[in-house]
Amino acid sequence: MSSGIILLLVAIVLLVIIAYVVGVVIRKRNDTLIANLETRKQELVDLPVQEEIEQVKLLHLIGQSQSTFREWNQKWTDLSTNSFKDIDFHLVEAENLNDSFNFVRAKHEIDNVDSQLTIIEEDIVSIREALEVLKEQEEKNSARVTHALDLYETLQKSISEKEDNYGTTMPEIEKQLKNIEAEFSHFVTLNSTGDPIEASEVLNKAEEHTIALGQITEQIPAIVAKLEDDFPDQLDDLETGYRRLLEENYHFPEKDIEQRFQEVREAIRSNSDGLVSLDLDRARDENEHIQEKIDKLYDIFEREIAAYKVAHKDSKIIPQFLAHAKSNNEQLGHEIKRLSAKYILNENESLSLRSFTNDLEEIETKVLPSVENFGQEASPYTHLQILFERTLKTLTTVEENQMEVFEAVKTIESVETRARQNMDKYVNKLHMIKRFMEKRNLPGIPQDFLSTFFTTSSQIEALINELSRGRIDIEAVSRLNDVTTNAIANLEQATYLVVQDATLTEQLLQYSNRYRSFEQNVQKSFEQALYLFEVEHNYKASFDEISYALETVEPGVTDRFVTSYEKTQERIRF
């Protein structure tokens, strides 16, 4: 055998071996792929889809939800009964083809099964998600329905337990409960017949009506309590109190109290009847009006009771106060009468008792009977309180004015005493001033000083004459005393000025000698000042004339002389 043939045979054998090895490798790989596909299929088969479907079945879906569930359930049935069987068939076919080394067809079957499994996986995911959505939706719907029913049942139970608290509104509340119950029944009917949208709307209304009725029923007991308990109790209390006050002889300015009681009763009854409509705002407003009427009645009674306490206390004070004021008036009258014998008293308000007497007589005739018959007259105590308070105010004013008269009376005799003391003092001062002027050895007395002196003397004389009368005019004495006091003070001041002007003029005239020989103006002023001093006795004008001339030649000289004089000035010794 030639070497070429041998090489050919060897090559063929090698190719066969290589082909076999490749076939074995491909077959092994395909076995692995088929096994993986088998595992994927088994994992899908093992998914709890059927259990989830059974759980959803237990929810008793209705309407659109039930139709949706049926579609997904049918899809799962198709997958579990047909698709998986078809995959099993193709997997067996792929195994057979792979075992027979028909790798191309085997690979085709493997790819086909892979594609089918991918589609099945996606379908199963969709099925499970749809089932979960149905479960969640049903749970929400169920929870919503349960919540609405719980609200209704709770409300129904609460109303049943507190039925007595709703008064006349109970029939309307029961009617509302029946309407809500009918709405729930309608919801169940619609839900069962597969109309979930309308059923949801009905459920919404039922829930809203339940909540609204609950809010209303929470407010009703407080309103009913006022109408059935509070107001009647207050009205009974008012009527009982009114009867007791009448028995105790109370009287009221308001003459329609019985009518007001009746109006309150009618308002309570009317509001109770109107509450049937469940118009709570109107009922509350009306309750407030009723309470205001009741409060006004309480105010009337409390005002009279309080007025009684004040008026009763005042009725004990007024007689004593009146007696005290009358006693004061009598004492004042006696004192004024005594003083009238000695003094001329003008009929002025400060010493007049007429207004006091009139006030006291009016109280005695118009008020005292009410005081003495307190508790027996048919007068409201509020009226008596006002009358008595006004009376006490009048008595207080009378007493204050009486005290002023007492003070005025007390000062009358002291006015005379003080005037007599001043009279003696003023006469003495007048003599001392006269002697003081005489000692000055002046060339003459200025006319204006003489006028002041004689005027003061006349005023002192007038005071002496007034005090010498049998009956002294005390007002005239008081006036003359004041006038004389001022006159003496003015005369004393005028005396000091005259003496000062005269003394300073003499000093300045002497001092001017040092300038007269060479200052013509000083010489001229000297002559004029000397004339005013010795002839006209106008010491003030003389001082002004010479001081002005000296100031022109020696500024400040006048102040120097004035200061020196003031330090050594002689005072009148009274």
Curated annotation (Swiss-Prot):
UniProt-listed NCBIfam families: PRK04778.1-1 (NF003407), PRK04778.1-4 (NF003410)
Purpose of the protein: Negative regulator of FtsZ ring formation; modulates the frequency and position of FtsZ ring formation. Inhibits FtsZ ring formation at polar sites. Interacts either with FtsZ or with one of its binding partners to promote depolymerization.
Under Pfam families, the record lists: EzrA
InterPro entries, alphabetized: EzrA
Entry GO CC: plasma membrane; septin ring
Subcellular location per UniProt equals: Cell membrane
Instruction: Tell me which family the UniProt entry assigns to this protein.
Output: Belongs to the EzrA family.
> Membrane topology per the record?
Single-pass membrane protein
GO process annotations (BP): division septum assembly; septin ring assembly
Residue ranges in the Extracellular topological domain are 1-7
What are the entry keywords?
Cell cycle, Cell division, Cell membrane, Coiled coil, Membrane, Septation, Transmembrane, Transmembrane helix
Q: Its domain of life?
A: Bacteria
Instruction: Pull the Cytoplasmic topological domain ranges from the record.
Output: 27-574
Major place of residence:
membrane
What transmembrane ranges does the database entry give? 8-26
Q: What is the lineage of its organism?
A: Bacteria, Bacillati, Bacillota, Bacilli, Lactobacillales
Write the protein's name.
Septation ring formation regulator EzrA
Q: Does the keyword Cell membrane apply?
A: yes
Q: Which residues form a coiled coil?
A: 104-141, 275-343, 473-525
